[in-house]
Amino acid sequence: MRRIAVVGAAGRMGKNLIEAVQQTGGAAGLTAAVDRPDSTLVGADAGELAGLGRIGVPLSGDLGKVCEEFDVLIDFTHPSVTLKNIEQCRKARRAMVIGTTGFSADEKLLLAEAAKDIPIVFAANFSVGVNLCLKLLDTAARVLGDEVDIEIIEAHHRHKVDAPSGTALRMGEVVAQALGRDLQEVAVYGREGQTGARARETIGFATVRAGDVVGDHTVLFAAEGERVEITHKASSRMTFARGAVRAALWLEGKENGLYDMQDVLGLR
């Protein structure tokens, strides 16, 4: 049995992750659950927090105290928290699955450096469908080439704190790489006022934050007379949770290194 720990276990995604671990039919088991040290829920049973009934795993407020109790940590928190957790796992030689978004370029370099010592799966989105879309986007960009305008539209719930979403940025990276462009040079984030005519080489991003939208992403390839749209819509966070647990199981026996869901799904 793969021993899995979830950090941020008292949050919405954390509860979904706990449920997904418990749905593996014995292939994995939740052996540790961690949340903020100042959480009033520390000591509560993780299964009860997730609405699953008692499972005998108390919520801890200190990752360092439970590092011997798991093989892989699943982390969907905040960049500042994740970076601290990476150092803990690095010292304890524990694998990680990271779904945190909003990292800066420099922070991603720190993550890559840590992957020299432990195996890490890092992805902006753990949905199987989204990762299939990334493969389709690469093909579409190569076929349609420079003859289309490319726009990426994403929508999420009102509580999401980063924009554009990590998934939207990853989609932009895939398209830009397929076209031989540098996303940092061609990305346009929102438009306002007298913008002038659209430059063909740009990749536009539009962001919506409203209600309880779990996650919608559309990449638009617009030419004269026709357009192609590749869309993914998530209706439940369990989609991401199951993908993250799948990645945690896949990591067993893997060498140190930085992987993503394309590796996990055999799409690379």
From Swiss-Prot:
The gene is dapB. InterPro entries: DapB_C, DapB_N, DapB_N_CS, DHDPR_bac, NAD(P)-bd_dom_sf. The lineage of its organism: Bacteria, Pseudomonadati, Pseudomonadota, Gammaproteobacteria, Pseudomonadales. This is 4-hydroxy-tetrahydrodipicolinate reductase. Belongs to the DapB family. Its EC number is 1.17.1.8. NAD(+) binds at residues 8-13, 35, 99-101, 123-126. (S)-2,3,4,5-tetrahydrodipicolinate binds at residues 157, 166-167. GO terms for cellular component: cytosol. Catalyzes the conversion of 4-hydroxy-tetrahydrodipicolinate (HTPA) to tetrahydrodipicolinate. Pathway: Amino-acid biosynthesis; L-lysine biosynthesis via DAP pathway; (S)-tetrahydrodipicolinate from L-aspartate: step 4/4.
